[in-house]
Amino acid sequence: MRKKLTALVLSALPLAAVADVSLYGEIKAGVEGRNYQLQLTEAQAANGGASGQVKVTKVTKAKSRIRTKISDFGSFIGFKGSEDLGDGLKAVWQLEQDVSVAGGGATQWGNRESFIGLAGEFGTLRAGRVANQFDDASQAIDPWDSNNDVASQLGIFKRHDDMPVSVRYDSPEFSGFSGSVQFVPIQNSKSAYTPAYYTKNTNNNLTLVPAVVGKPGSDVYYAGLNYKNGGFAGNYAFKYARHANVGRNAFELFLIGSGSDQAKGTDPLKNHQVHRLTGGYEEGGLNLALAAQLDLSENGDKTKNSTTEIAATASYRFGNAVPRISYAHGFDFIERGKKGENTSYDQIIAGVDYDFSKRTSAIVSGAWLKRNTGIGNYTQINAASVGLRHKF
């Protein structure tokens, strides 16, 4: 059996050399714990005696137990390659797949960034499941590894990161500047989806309202502009969809940790556009990144929605240890032309990576996320994780 395996490996080596195929990936997992804290403030009427009824405030607080589990932190495996076609032209391809060392996970190949394309002096043209410009920019602002992409990563801030089935063009670099454009056809955009839920009637009986699947949104357009000069780097990312299936409900779903395509499409909007500006500086062991994001949309009744957010990450290498901290803040949002009072959120993630070697590291982090949901109301998530990461 060993002889057969050896022969198979040796016979594959010349093929790999000719085709220029690379195998790469990351295996990362660990132990995570989290709990939720809620506060609900309600105004109620009470009997005030001779003065009649008066309003009193009822404050309800709830706290979940700490839930601990062994989780995969986003392991994946990938293959990529290229072929020289002559005259400076190359064929390029990549196939990436999520894997899980904690069991379960994806059931189909190519569920991460996977594409085929051409590269040359004109730039690079790719078609397939290609990361958008927001996903590119997030590599600097959110380097955290975790199974909890809402609290232990900047999941709310990164809700527009995606790898849609699309075609993307990246230009060559000119004096430090480069750009890109990306097109997602309507057939590949996400469908509007309202999940099933229960409602109470006057007799307090629960009635199930079934899920509703709507039509896809519209074509989606992305664009990006990059600049790099020494240790300084900047990125601008833009998204536009005339009819979009992301909105207020999707924002809430991201808060509770849902990451499926269906969960992202629950509130059809018009003229949805997102702008994100990211800047970074790297010198020696110091890494700094700042980002600001503006999310704009319209409703069917012509009223407007908007959210404004900022995020920052800083790290510094001390020998084998890299301590890091991130902060994100979302200002009170505007919904249907009206400002939502006390609807902001704050998030802090702190941790350290310790490198045993160039490819293997221990990763430790703690996270705190508080989302205000009205005057006197909030949802808070506390999380911590410790794990191991190996790159190959």
Curated annotation (Swiss-Prot):
The organism named in the record is: Neisseria meningitidis serogroup B (strain ATCC BAA-335 / MC58)
Keyword flag Membrane: yes
Record's bilayer topology term: Multi-pass membrane protein
Q: What is this protein called?
A: Major outer membrane protein P.IA
Query: Which InterPro entries does the entry link to?
Result: Gram-neg_bact_OMP, Gram_neg_porin_domain, Porin_dom_sf, Porin_Gram-ve, Porin_Gram-ve_CS, Porin_Neis
Family label: Belongs to the Gram-negative porin family.
Q: Which GO terms describe its cellular component?
A: cell outer membrane; pore complex
Upper lineage ranks?
A: Bacteria, Pseudomonadati, Pseudomonadota, Betaproteobacteria, Neisseriales
Task: Report whether Transport shows up as a keyword of the record.
Answer: yes
Q: Which GO terms describe its molecular function?
A: porin activity
